Amino acid sequence: MVYQQFINYPHLNVFENVAFPLKQRKVDDQVIADEVTKSLKSVGLEGYENRKIQELSGGQQQRVSLARSLVKNAKILLLDEPLVNLDYKLREQLREEFKNIFSQGLSEDSIVVFSTTDPREAMEINGEVIVLDEGKVLQVGPAKEIFENPKTLKVAEISNDPPMNILKASIETNKIKFEEIEVELPNHLSNLKEKNFNLGIRASDIKLSDSGFEFEVELAEISGSETLLHLKRGNSRIIISIEEVLNFNIHDKVKISFNISKIYAFNENGVLSSSPFGGSYV
């Protein structure tokens, strides 16, 4: 098991930390040396065997913890939010490396249970995803299926960062209407049974546009290399993501357009009625 807090033995060096569970089992010294070398190589710490734990960065310490778990050749590996205490850059780096580590450092019949509150981690690491909310299973399936066809409004909110925008909308004469805005009814919603529905659209599917609809800026949030704009119009609140760092002031007026081919429809009970990818749970 790998915890969110780095748990290593401070009085032991890297090799001794990783070898510890095998020493406890009284495994042959040569086997220990081979297995530790293999595990350290899989987590990118080959050559660090004699380093003291205190000499390592946070990311390196977490890799030592992971190597110690891998060296056991356990059938089930549980990682409890292993990246949460790392800085942004390290999280990005290790998230990419974990996929390679799992494929190289584990046997084919091993199972990895990766717990996270970050939907990006779940989607990027991939595999089978279980969406939980207050202990209740909301949806189970491949990461791609969860992303493309979230079963309910709650799943759509949980499995996206920022959460999927949800707006109260209605269909009238082949138009979608909300907050005095009208957009064309996309083909994938043409057979929608209900007139009134919850419209879902991701932040990345809304763009700034000189010919778009006017909204007011409530907050401009810089996140890495992108800007998240929190906007309002009437009683509706939405977030859009811009793939560059831009400056906005509160109460600025901006115009935006919606990619109607990426609109989701959830019925009044919050269940997916139609998605751009053909999914429906009604």
Tell what function each PLM region has.
Residues 164, 175-282:
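Non-catalytic connector elements of ABC transporters
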Residues 148-172, 259:
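C-terminal boundary and immediately downstream tail of ABC-type ATPase nucleotide-binding domains
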Residues 120, 144, 153, 165, ...:
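Glycine-centered loop/turn positions within well-structured domains
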Residues 4, 11-151:
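ABC ATPase nucleotide-binding domains
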Residues 142, 154, 170, 216-218:
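Residues located in well-ordered beta-strands
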